[in-house]
Amino acid sequence: MRYLALALVLAVAGAATLARAQDAIPDIKGTWSGKGKVLVFGNNVHNPGKQTMAEAPRMRDIEMTDVVEGQDGRLAWGRSSSRAADTKEPFAWAMSSVNKSIVGADTDGYFRITLLAPDRMEKCYVHSGMSPSKSMVATCYAMERVKK
């Protein structure tokens, strides 16, 4: 009977440890890089051209780098740049309590991010025609954490 009680105590302790490990907030600091397609009305520094909002949209390839400079619990911040423009545009992200979903903003648009693995995420980004660039974009693509 003593062994059964000991086994039960160990099982409960193990389950509690596993639950705490699953609840751990992921560390997302570092450099993330990805490529994808973006739908663009008009133009902006990351999607250059002479197109206007009145013209048909265009699809472009984009390559972005997000550097998550800091993280405090579920809040993270950093800077974004693209192959077309090294703007180092600031962003702010907030992670949900399930530790997989992130929402965020930069100076003219919004992020919706899903953490797929410790070093992989799907990043969706949009900004409206009311943004400072007077362009409109929508995109989703995978990003990988750059290993050093």
Show which residues each predicted segment covers:
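Positively charged n-region of N-terminal signal peptides that target proteins for export
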Residues: M1-L4, A16
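Bacterial N-terminal signal peptides
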Residues: A7-A15
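Sec/Tat signal peptide C-region and signal peptidase I cleavage site
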Residues: T17-A21
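Short, solvent-exposed loop/hinge segments that bridge or flank secondary-structure elements
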Residues: D23-W77, P132-K148
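Generic short beta-strand segments
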Residues: S33-F41, S81, T107-D108, C124-S128
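Contiguous, well-ordered beta-strand patches that form the walls/edges
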Residues: E63-A117
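Short, exposed beta-strand-loop hairpins at the edges of beta-sheets
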Residues: M121-M136
